[in-house]
Amino acid sequence: MLVGVDEEKYVIPTITIQKAFKPGQDEYFTVEGKGEMVKDRGSLIPLVRLNEIYGTSKNKKSIDQCLVVVVESKEEKRALMIDELLGKDEYVIKNLGGSMDDVQGIAGGAILADGKVGLILDVHGIFSIVSQK
């Protein structure tokens, strides 16, 4: 699934996606020692701000300005905060090579319909990044 975060476009592998929704303020919580959470069907899911992980924006957006995509890897769930859903398509993963090989949370790149490169997210790698914080 192609998503937008700030001016960037990312591809989230559909096999990892549980659901996408727009949470209300009553579904957003900050839990001491655990950080930001989103409530879904009675469960609290840790919130991941992609713009903070990849440094695309210094502005902390309000939860009611965004969507979340709930993803799962190895029976662990996280809610990725995004700005918009841009569509669902099939993409071929291309190795980005060079200095991009070691970027945690990025599986590769894909050429998008507009000719630009979208970064393909490695969901398990993102989970590792946020676990280290």
Give the predicted meaning of each segment:
Residues 1-133:
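Glycine/threonine-rich ATP-lid/beta-loop region of ATP-binding domains
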